[in-house]
C-alpha cells in the first residue's frame, strides 16, 4: 500500500513539473507576441517605389501606424537589416535603430520616417530587407516586422550627367546675357581729347630741290636757285 502511495506521489510530481514548464514557455511567447489585431501598418518608399536602392544613398521609408487597441500605445524603435535573399536569417548589414518614443492614442494614426544607407561597397544584386517596429502598451513590449521582402541594390548614380551639364551651360548663358544687357545700359565715360595749340607763327622752309621741282618746265627753271627760304608770318 505504501509503495502504491509513493508511486502516485511521484507521478503527481512529474505532472506538476511538466505543467510548470508549459506555463513558463507560454509566458515567454506572450512577451514576444505581436497582436496584429491591435495595430495595422502601411509603408511607402517615396523615392524608391520600384524597390531599387542605390548603394551609398539614403533610403527613406514612411511607416503608417494605426492604433486599433483600447488604450494608448507607445512607438519606441524602428530598425532594419539587409539579409541574404534566399535565407533571411543570414544578416549582411544591420542598420541604426531609430528612437522615437511617440505615444499613439487609441483610434489614432501616426506616420513615421525611417532612413538607412546601404553600404556603397555592396554589389549590385538582389538582397532581402527586413524592417521592424517596436512598441509597448505600458506593460509589454511588442515587435512587428511590417516589411519582409527582396529589394535590388543598384550602382550609385553619378552626381554629374549630361542633363546637369546642359543645365549648367544654360545657366551660364543666362547669366552672361543678363550681364551683357546690364553692361550695355551703363553710362559710358566721355573721352577727353587733348587739343594742341597751333603756333600763330608758321614757318615754311623750302630747299633748292623743292623750288627746282616746282619751277620745272618754266622759264625760271634755268635760273640757279641755291636756296630759298621763306618765312611767312601771320599778322596777329
UniProtKB/Swiss-Prot annotation:
UniProt topological domain (Lumenal) ranges: 21-163
Keywords tagged on the record: Calcium, Endoplasmic reticulum, Glycoprotein, Membrane, Phosphoprotein, Signal, Transmembrane, Transmembrane helix
Signal peptide range? 1-20
Q: How does it sit in the membrane?
A: Single-pass type I membrane protein
For this UniProt entry, which segments traverse the membrane? Answer: 164-184
List the InterPro entries hit by this protein, alphabetically. TRAP_alpha
Point out the glycosylated residues in this chain: 74, 94, 141, 148, 152
Question: What are the cysteine partners in each disulfide bond?
Answer: none
Where is the protein found, in the record's own terms? Answer: Endoplasmic reticulum membrane
Q: Which residues lie on this side of the membrane: Cytoplasmic?
A: 185-236
**One Pfam family, short name please?**
TRAP_alpha
**One GO CC term on file:** phagocytic vesicle
Q: How is it modified after translation?
A: Phosphorylated in its cytoplasmic tail.
The UniProt entry's sequence similarity note says: Belongs to the TRAP-alpha family.
- Function in brief: TRAP proteins are part of a complex whose function is to bind calcium to the ER membrane and thereby regulate the retention of ER resident proteins.
Query: What other facts are recorded?
Result: Seems to bind calcium.
The domain section of the record reads: Shows a remarkable charge distribution with the N-terminus being highly negatively charged, and the cytoplasmic C-terminus positively charged.
Q: Quaternary structure?
A: Heterotrimer of TRAP-alpha, TRAP-beta and TRAP-gamma.
Q: Which PANTHER family match?
A: TRANSLOCON-ASSOCIATED PROTEIN SUBUNIT ALPHA, TRANSLOCON-ASSOCIATED PROTEIN, ALPHA SUBUNIT
- The name of this protein is Translocon-associated protein subunit alpha
Q: What is the lineage of its organism?
A: Eukaryota, Amoebozoa, Evosea, Eumycetozoa, Dictyostelia
Amino acid at each position: 500500500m505504501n509503495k502504491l502511495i509513493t508511486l502516485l506521489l511521484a507521478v503527481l510530481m512529474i505532472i506538476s513539473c511538466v505543467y510548470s514548464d508549459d506555463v513558463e514557455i507560454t509566458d515567454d511567447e506572450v512577451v514576444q507576441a505581436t497582436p496584429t489585431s491591435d495595430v495595422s501598418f502601411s509603408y511607402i518608399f517615396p523615392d524608391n517605389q520600384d524597390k531599387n536602392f542605390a548603394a551609398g544613398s539614403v533610403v527613406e521609408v514612411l511607416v503608417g501606424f494605426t492604433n486599433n487597441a483600447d488604450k494608448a500605445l507607445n512607438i519606441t524603435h524602428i530598425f532594419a537589416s539587409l539579409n541574404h535573399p534566399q535565407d533571411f536569417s543570414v544578416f549582411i548589414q544591420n542598420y541604426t535603430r531609430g528612437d522615437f518614443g511617440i505615444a499613439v492614442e487609441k483610434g489614432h494614426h501616426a506616420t513615421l520616417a525611417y532612413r538607412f544607407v546601404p553600404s556603397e561597397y555592396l554589389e549590385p544584386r538582389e538582397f532581402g530587407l527586413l524592417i521592424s517596429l517596436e512598441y509597448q502598451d505600458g506593460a509589454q513590449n511588442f515587435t512587428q516586422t511590417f516589411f519582409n521582402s527582396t529589394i535590388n541594390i543598384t550602382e550609385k548614380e553619378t552626381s554629374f550627367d549630361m542633363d546637369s551639364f546642359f543645365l549648367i551651360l544654360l545657366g551660364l548663358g543666362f547669366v552672361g546675357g543678363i550681364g551683357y544687357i546690364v553692361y550695355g545700359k551703363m553710362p559710358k565715360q566721355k573721352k577727353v581729347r587733348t587739343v594742341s595749340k597751333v603756333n600763330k607763327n608758321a614757318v615754311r622752309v623750302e630747299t633748292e630741290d623743292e623750288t627746282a621741282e616746282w619751277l620745272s618746265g618754266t622759264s625760271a627753271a634755268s635760273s640757279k636757285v641755291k636756296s630759298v627760304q621763306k618765312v611767312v608770318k601771320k599778322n596777329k
